[in-house]
Amino acid sequence: GFKDLKITNAAGECVFALNAELDGIVSGDKSFSLDGCTKFSFTRREVFFDDMIKGELAKPLDSMKDLVIVRSDGSPVFHIANVCDDMAQKITHIVRGDDHVENTYRHILLFNALGYDIPKYAHMPMIVNKQGKPYSKRDGDAFVGDFREKGFMADAFFNYLTFLGWSPGDDREKMTRDELVLAFELERVKSSPAQLDMNKLQNLNGMYLAEMPFDIFVKQAETAVAEFDWSQGVDNDYFNTVAQLLQSRTKLFSQVDGWSYFFTDSVEYNMKNLKKALKKDEVRSGMNKVVTDLGQLTCFDAESIGSVIEVAGDVFELGSGKLNQPLRVCVTGGGIGADLLETMVVLGKEKCVSRIEAALAIDLAAE
């Protein structure tokens, strides 16, 4: 217990002792008390330590004031409680954020006063936002639960956080927990702040989703879409087909509301995007031929659809792929997505034809 542990001043006088319950027992000279609190007085000298990440750190103590260690109500403050807890658990290594560097100088003095060996310290870089400020809830998600609710997988989040300020020394970005544990070395941790990049985190999460067993992916996707009206009464086989197409492109289950165009009869168009896609006369002419020829197909597969698009492009002297983006906007309402031909096959001829016709019928000049 802490019964015999005492803190002494530079003259060797006891100013504070701790019993087994960590209750403060004030003893010693009144000069160490101010308004009922107890302060730790120390000799003004340089304090230094060899940090496992930042190297040797030192601080001249001529500007440091005596340290309050016990409040007026007798309860210990963070510094003395922290040091005594480390002593009780025989802590040899302390790894924490570098916002505690200033505290470490004070703790070293307390360890010395208590006659305890100084633990080895490793101060990790802080996670910062795009402005270089410490990341906080003002920047958005700040708690692990926030990321879980957004649909981030635990292993992906663990993977990403480990890579903040650290690297394995090779080009690997996706690693299992066991691989991370085996590869991790404090010596490879950078001392500079690490910026949280949500795009990188989402991309990494997408890699994990892409490798998830399909039956698990489908089950979680079904749970995620259940809140949307368009998901009600969906055929299971059709849903599985859509999920199989989109698994490799899904980064978060919270984004599955973007799957709606597969399940609704029509789509809502962003007029700005539609105008951009159909602004050229030759493109509109090509699209008119595409929709006519698609309607005549007896086999609506990727090869047949691709041939229709290619022929229309040649007829109106459009370069390779110039009709792909306009087609995507017309049939999905968006500008990005899974493979266009595979998407159209899943949607089926009726939906593709009706959506293209609807888009071409819009008077864009009036919009």
Task: Annotate the PLM regions.
Residues 102, 114-120, 124-269, 332-367:
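Catalytic adenosine-cofactor/nucleotide-binding cores of aminoacyl-tRNA synthetases and other
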Residues 95-96, 146, 297-298:
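A generic structural signal for short
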Residues 29-48, 87-96, 149-151, 155-156, ...:
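Short, charge-rich amphipathic segments
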Residues 97, 147, 313, 317:
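Short, charged/polar micro-motifs that form catalytic or ligand-binding hotspots
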